[in-house]
Amino acid sequence: MDLTIQPHKLSGTVTVPPSKSLAHRAVICAALSDGTCKIDNIALSDDIIATIEAMKAFGAIIEQEGSALTITGAGQYVTEAKVAESATTAEHLIDCNESGSTLRFVVPISTLFQGASRFV
């Protein structure tokens, strides 16, 4: 049997139990997209707040309402930076708030964006 998978845009809803590990990944994926995502049932620990603030520093717009986040991603900045010589070279100040998970995720992500990143 041959199976062909055709690429399509994704849309829909996924509900997962609150998990700090999954929350880091969900926030980062949404923040790197070039669309808007809503994530419900987020447990806002200090580590997750550090990841949220880091993604904001790269240009994502993140709004909180209760345990839900609406994230407009900064993915367009990554694409534009790769094709535009005049992309911003502003320094990104990232305060990981002593979150090892945030630091481990965000250091490699910082290489996607123009300009230096300083981690404190």
Language-model features and meaning:
Residues 1-120:
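Short, structured segments at the rim of ligand-binding sites
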